Amino acid sequence: MTTRGLMLVLLLVAPPALAAELPHEVAEFVARRDRCDHFRGEDAENPARIREIQRGLRANCEGTDAALARLKQRFAGHAAARAVLDRYDDAVE
């Protein structure tokens, strides 16, 4: 197997394995915040797409700053959770 093939296999297998060791609340936050970050990175000129992005931002970003702070405090002693949570910006709203 080539190095590229091995990396692809690892990328496909690692996220479910990581999610299995994360507390459910953290895994849910990660999914929501990743959707938020996706919409934050969008740029559009089409008015319909702009409205869709704005809806996505409201649905996925609002409240995540407070949720991140709360989860970091709650799971301060959980190394895997903190490692994942520390990847996110503290203020995106």
Language model features: what each stretch is:
Residues R40-E93:
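Compact alpha-helical subdomains of small soluble proteins
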Residues L10-L11:
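Short S/T/G/P-rich N-terminal loop/turn motif that feeds into the first structured element of a domain
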Residues A14-P16:
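N-terminal signal peptide c-region/cleavage motif recognized by signal peptidases
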Residues G5, E25-V26, R49:
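Single-residue recognition of alpha-helix capping/boundary positions
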Residues M1-M7:
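Bacterial N-terminal signal peptides that target proteins for export
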